[in-house]
From Swiss-Prot:
Reaction(s) catalysed (UniProt annotation): GTP + H2O = GDP + phosphate + H(+)
G1: annotated span: 19-26
PROSITE patterns reported for this sequence: G_TR_1, G_TR_2
Keyword vocabulary terms for this entry: Cytoplasm, Elongation factor, GTP-binding, Hydrolase, Magnesium, Metal-binding, Nucleotide-binding, Protein biosynthesis
Pfam families: GTP_EFTU, GTP_EFTU_D2, GTP_EFTU_D3
Descriptive protein name: Elongation factor Tu-A
Annotated stretches, region: G5: 174-176
HAMAP family linked: EF_Tu_B
A molecular function GO annotation: translation elongation factor activity
Taxonomic classification: Bacteria, Bacillati, Bacillota, Clostridia, Thermoanaerobacterales
Domain tr-type G: 10-209
Region (G3): 81-84
Originating gene: tufA
InterPro entries reported in the protein's UniProt record: EF-Tu_GTP-bd, EF-Tu_GTPase, EFTu-like_2, EFTU_2, G_TR_CS, P-loop_NTPase, Small_GTP-bd, T_Tr_GTP-bd_dom
Length: 400
């Protein structure tokens, strides 16, 4: 079959497999690529190819991840699969692989296991909005009542973490049997289940809103004055669009936020009608003095984001080998928190009953910053000590 030209006409969605070790995440990933390849919608990737995931660095942390791509009649997908449990934790906390939806793989023979629970919790905390379930290894279970029991357990678990467990689509099948058969026909007992799963992913996980359609936000990286014209803030537009005449708010580092109007937008020293997500720009701000805007603040559409000092976070603490701490930290630990473009000192409060946090741990903690930062749930940050990264985190809830 001639290799098809990749066309960017279909909407794009990021997904990934999550679930307990050895429940079949990688086998399922291989099966999806094989079955879809029969319809010319993917390149088949073998288990071994996916399993030997290359190392990547995200925010100074080494993560092993495999990316595969495939499409259905409706959409184009990028799919991540991680070999080890620690890789999932790091991936989800750093946002190295932002998922619009996840395929939770649970062995019908074993039912939910500790990492099943931890991955659902992580998905909830880091903002993976949708989960669909593949009950794998159905060929190893003779009693249909057992499968129903596992299905009920999974729905319960999803409900516990505020996912709509009762309405979550669950597909029962066997990734291994589909791989072994490989006929790719919809009417096949095993291959058909992979098609059913892809239909569910197509229908149940919505196409995400594009960054460009979200409200404007730009982290300020630098500020300078243009004589006779005023103050310019530079940075990369994180989301939305901005044009001359737009009202923007300067937020962060103080409790007061100020509104101003954009009087000029420049990119590569040329004026621009409108800048959008991904552009590196300079924004000329009306009536703003050089000292009234600084690195670490953000420019945003008024009313869309607020400054906060107290929040709850999911944090991964780097190991010594990753360049992190060699020793644990305790309640009251005061490192720097690096948000977007700047470091802010903060104090850590550990959960009740947690004495200390060891390098390599994944923990929920509370933080109080000494100055407010423009913040919302899902915002990523690094924890630093003397300029080196010792942890990675994501804001899971705002306290005040």
């Amino acid at each position: 079959m001639a290799k098809q030209k990749f066309e960017r006409t279909k909407p794009h969605v990021n997904v990934g497999t999550i679930g307990h070790v050895d429940h079949g995440k990688t086998t399922l990933t291989a099966a999806i690529t094989l079955i879809l390849s029969k319809a010319g919608l993917a390149q088949a990737k073998g288990y071994d190819e996916i399993d030997k995931a290359p190392e990547e660095k995200a925010r100074g942390i080494t993560i092993n991840t495999t990316h595969v791509e495939y499409e259905t009649a409706k959409r184009h997908y990028a799919h991540v699969d991680c070999p080890g449990h620690a890789d999932y934790v790091k991936n989800m906390i750093t946002g190295a692989a932002q998922m619009d939806g996840a395929i939770l793989v649970v062995s019908a023979a074993d039912g939910p296991m500790p990492q099943t629970r931890e991955h659902i919790l992580l998905a909830r905390q880091v903002g993976v909005p949708y989960i669909v379930v593949f009950l794998n290894k159905a060929d190893m279970v003779d009693d249909p009542e057992l499968i129903e029991l596992v299905e009920m357990e999974v729905r319960d678990l999803l409900n516990q973490y505020e996912f709509p467990g009762d309405d979550t689509p669950i597909v029962v099948g066997s990734a291994l049997k589909a791989l072994e058969c490989g006929c790719g026909k919809r009417e096949c007992q095993w291959c058909g289940k992979i098609w059913e799963l892809m239909d569910v992913v197509d229908e149940y996980i919505p196409t995400p809103e594009r960054d460009i359609d979200k409200p404007f936000l730009m982290p300020v990286e630098d500020v300078f004055t243009i004589t006779g014209r005023g103050t310019v803030a530079t940075g990369r537009v994180e989301r939305g669009k901005v044009k001359v005449g737009d009202e923007v708010e300067i937020i962060g580092l103080t409790t007061e936020s100020r509104k101003t109007v954009v009087t000029g937008v420049e990119m590569f020293r040329k004026t621009l009608d409108e800048a959008q997500a991904g552009d590196n720009i300079g924004v000329l701000l009306r009536g703003i003095q050089r000292d009234e805007v600084e690195r670490g603040q953000v420019l945003a559409k008024p009313g869309t984001i607020k400054p906060h000092t107290k929040f709850e976070a999911q944090v991964y603490v780097l190991t010594k080998e990753e360049g992190g701490r060699h020793t644990p930290f305790f309640n009251g630990y005061r490192p720097q928190f690096y948000f977007r473009t700047t470091d802010v000192t903060g104090t850590i409060q550990l959960p009740e009953g947690v004495e200390m946090v060891m390098p390599g741990d994944h923990v929920t903690l509370r933080v109080e910053l000494i100055t407010p930062i423009a913040m919302e749930e899902g915002l990523k940050f690094a924890i630093r000590e003397g300029g080196r990264t010792v942890g990675a985190g994501v804001v899971s809830a705002i306290i005040e």
